[in-house]
């Protein structure tokens, strides 16, 4: 019982669901069903739960391609909790990831421009930062698993990006 997760789980079951049963292999299914039923009701909507705990601000993380229409709707609504977004450009720098060129095409559409060079990529990201800022974003969030370092020149970076856009392999 030294793991705080044990205590947090029981605290949250009691605080949010009025469930005081001990969670174990015998009670798990009953607790699952009870919480599932409550979460499907209007009283347990995300908004209601946030208001119940007196949340003042909630931050989400959004990709630069996100149109932010949900955030715009929340700003116009009567929801009392401030919902802000954080700009999360991870996919724009993960050049070795599957689907990278498709992602860059999506980013180009979101920025209303073609991305054919590294400069274009930087310009598209700047445009999206301005768009996010216009929509109240003041934070940036990065979720990279690892940060690699190689000493590349600017011309090498441009060349690697161009080769990737052309579908050619290049050393990373």
Task: List each language-model region with its residue ranges.
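Metal-cofactor-binding active-site regions of metalloenzymes
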Residues: 1-172
């Amino acid at each position: 019982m030294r793991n705080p997760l044990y205590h947090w789980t029981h605290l949250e079951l009691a605080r949010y669901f009025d469930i005081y049963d001990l969670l174990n292999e015998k009670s798990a299914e009953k607790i699952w069903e009870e919480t599932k039923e409550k979460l499907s009701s209007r009283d347990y909507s995300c908004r209601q739960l946030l208001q119940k705990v007196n949340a003042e601000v909630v931050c989400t993380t959004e990709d630069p391609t996100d149109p932010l229409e949900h955030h715009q709707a929340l700003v116009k609504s009567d929801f009392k909790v401030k919902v802000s977004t954080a700009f999360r450009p991870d996919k724009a720098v993960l050049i070795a990831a599957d689907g990278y060129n498709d992602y860059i095409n999506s980013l180009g559409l979101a920025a209303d421009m073609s991305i054919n060079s590294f400069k274009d990529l930087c310009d598209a990201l700047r445009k999206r930062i301005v768009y996010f800022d216009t929509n109240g974003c003041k934070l940036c969030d990065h979720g990279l698993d690892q940060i690699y370092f190689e000493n590349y020149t600017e011309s090498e970076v441009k060349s690697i990006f161009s080769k990737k856009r052309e579908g050619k392999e290049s050393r990373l």
